[in-house]
Amino acid sequence: MFKLTRNKDEQSGSATFAMPLLPLRDIVVFPSMVVPLFVGRDKSVNALDKAMATDKKIFLAAQTKAKTDTPGESDIYRVGTVANILQILRLPDGTVKVLVEGDFRARISSFIPHPDHFFVSLEGLEESEDESVEIEALRRGVRAAFDAYSKHNKKINQEILDAVAAIDNASRLADTIAAYMPFKLDVKQKLLETLGVAKRLEKLFGQIRSEIEILQTEERIKGRVKKQMEKTQREYYLNEQMRAIQKEMGEKDDFKSELEELEKRIKRKKLSQEAAAKVRAEFKKLKLMSPMSAEATVVRNYIDWILSLPWYEKTRDKLDIDESIRILDEDHYGLEKPKERIIEYLAVQALVKRIKGPILCFVGPPGVGKTSLAKSIARAMNRNFIRLSLGGVRDEAEIRGHRRTYIGAMPGKIIQSLKKVKSNNPVFCLDEVDKMSMDFRGDPSAALLEVLDPEQNFSFNDHYLDLDYDLSEVFFITTANNLHSIPPPLRDRMEIIQIAGYTEFDKLNIGRNFLVAKQCKANGLSLDNIAFSDDMLLYIIRHYTKEAGVRNLEREIASICRKVAKEVVRRGPETRIELTEDLVQEYLGIPKFRYGVAEEKDEIGLAVGLAWTEFGGDILGIETVVMPGKGKVQITGKLGDVMQESAQAALSYVRSRAKRLGIDPDFYQNFDIHVHVPEGAIPKDGPSAGITMATSIVSALARIPVRSDLAMTGEITLRGRVLPIGGLKEKILAAHRALLKTVLIPKDNAKDLKDIPAKILEEIQVELVEHMDDVLRKAMVVPEDRELFHEEEAGAQQAVMFEQKPPAADEIRAH
């Protein structure tokens, strides 16, 4: 039994009263709000029964947590609404449906213990509802905001808008609109607890604006999604319409016919077991896909790549050795070593039907025919030829391809090239293998290790295909200018064949038999229009080219042919032009290079050395001057560390032999020495100029000239020994081009003379030296009234040396 201690007309003040409590889940009931509630908990049903037994009033308060089935005092908000029970209906499942109307706000002052239901002591809450301009402005703003909100929320119908428009009381307006808004429970509870009408309207206005922004954002998102869906549905509808029309007209479905064609190709194509299984699995997936999907295009391209590769297709090798020799000789003059290696391969293949393809590396200067020789090898073997330039390649994916997960992924260049050539046993030329570089994307030379390893390349795995592909029958030929630029692991997998520069006679033969005819044809001339005599070809070779190969020679011949073509057009097709030196100079300009000896006369302090470069051999003049000073030594010419150390070793040797060479032993205290190696802008390095520097220094200090028609090469030790060097063939060819008569080489390089053409050795005198004494005897032009060596002081000099460093000779030999 409870009793209201204040009359109904008093809905504010501090009077307390008691009544049953009905805890609510996920709903806040505002005053003047009529709402149906479903009540199922025993305590809540008992509270309704108690209220119905008295004056049908009950206190409605929201739970802080809706999931709590048995709420305690701390689980219920203190502010709620006193409501009138309008109607009650008991349902068959035991729950009760009750219709209530909110009356006024109240706050729980205390809970009254009761075993059957919640019973609370309440105090009514007084609202501040003073009419003011601010409240009127807020009322209009809230009503306008609610109207704007209703345009975005279709659940707010016109009937609700009319009901809201009819409310004049500001407090009731705020409560009614708050009841219709889908605010969170805590937001509605705060609005219920806000007694000041102006403040409540202000909070309500802000919340309505937030809801409008949320709905506008949702509409934009829905619009984008709907547009995309409409586009997809439209495309699907149009595709279906197209199929229906094609069916009516008796035409085949493009996608279906494409699948049928793919299926036929899969059945016809001979694939490896792994590739066949992969293709069947991918084709099965493709049949289940929409033809317009991006994934279908990716799968279709993948299957097409696999089917386009020559898994077992190959060309038949021509095993006629005589015919192969004829073709190789027809295409290239000289180059005996690589030709011999190809003939050996063909001979072995004739005896052993299946052998692994060799991996050759042609190393030589530009223009000597490395790439064209690879093409000629393919013609001689009756194989297809493919060339891949590796110059500047710095991405591993260029070799291995990209994985299919990337957009626009493709296989690497190896697989692409094999698809293009349509056979799995081509001659594959990897050009400029020494020009590759690496960066953050990987090292392409590391990816080539598998390609060029005969023990691994039968199962080369491209990232795009993700299948093992057999490269073992491919004849790989790589080309390089500099062997030292190739990483050692890669170099170890290849058979190195050095191709040296051409001699003057080789160039003459190549020019006469190959280049003249080629350029005449390229420029529309017949051999009757122009006459290249051997003398004129030699003149062009000597005065307009300075190279190991014949690329510049061909360029100069082409330039002459173009000039002659102009004359033929002017004078008529019967024109014939005989080349002379004057005419060559008219066509090509003044000679670019001086042909002849490095120096015209014997000079003091000037010795001619020989150098090796990537472009062939070259001569190297080394100059030394001696000036009064305090022993300063200056070495110039952009020299590397090794060459500077070689100069220091040469100087130390000269100091140790000063008396024997007739040089003042104190020269290093009284004179400054300057050693210079032209051309100053070109970097130079290496130890092979050691004896040349020593000869130049001795000549400058002893004031004895050095032969101008003699060149030398060799590394020097502190004891004067001459050590072997590399690149001998290129160096002797350079000496021959410079018309030098004599070349001094280390005795240990005698074995390399077999690589020098006999005709060169007939025209140039090669002398072997093993000590600086031998070099000086042969190189110095000693006047008749002077001696080069002062033998009487040799013993004393030797004694001085051993005093400075006791029995070092034996120790040096032991090392």
From Swiss-Prot:
Places the protein is found: Cytoplasm
Keywords: ATP-binding, Cytoplasm, Hydrolase, Nucleotide-binding, Protease, Serine protease, Stress response
Gene this chain is encoded by: lon1
Subunit-level organization: Homohexamer. Organized in a ring with a central cavity.
Top-level EC class: hydrolase
Gene3D superfamilies per UniProt: 1.10.8.60, 1.20.5.5270, 1.20.58.1480, 3.30.230.10, LON domain-like (2.30.130.40), P-loop containing nucleotide triphosphate hydrolases (3.40.50.300)
Family, as annotated: Belongs to the peptidase S16 family.
Any GO CC annotation of this UniProt entry: cytoplasm
Enzyme Commission (EC) number: 3.4.21.53
Record-level Gene Ontology MF annotations: ATP binding; ATP hydrolysis activity; ATP-dependent peptidase activity; sequence-specific DNA binding; serine-type endopeptidase activity
Binding site for ATP: G364, P365, P366, G367, V368, G369, K370, T371
Name of the protein described by the UniProt record: Lon protease 1
Organism: Syntrophobacter fumaroxidans (strain DSM 10017 / MPOB)
Chain spans, region Disordered: 793-815
Catalyzed reactions per annotation: Hydrolysis of proteins in presence of ATP
